[in-house]
Amino acid sequence: MNQSDKGLLLVDLCSRYPYGIIVRLDDKNVCVEEIKFSRGDYFFTLSGDKTYIGVLVERIKPYLRPISSMTPEEKEDFKKTFETYENTMGVELTYLSYASIDWLNAHHFDYRGLINKDLALEALPNMY
């Protein structure tokens, strides 16, 4: 894993941390319990059938949902997070707000393309 990919994965994991993250470690599905920064690197504490301490990001892959798996109900809910305002020319503009990105994180959608980069795995139905 190159430094750019490592940074992208760390940013993604940190933004999803409050919502719970299931990751693959070796051949096990485990949950991220804690993310720590020490001596210039990030370390993860993971729990499953046992607790794993000091795991480097290179050893894990989060389970994420492709945007294409969004249900019609989820799409409607997601649209409610958009912000709209009128500019000085009277044109109404709609954009993704912080709440939109937070919603995607909370629902474990892969909006950064991590699955295509082989940095994440596609979540199974009803995994989250």
Where are these regions (language model features)?
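Structural boundary micro-motifs
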Residues: 1-128
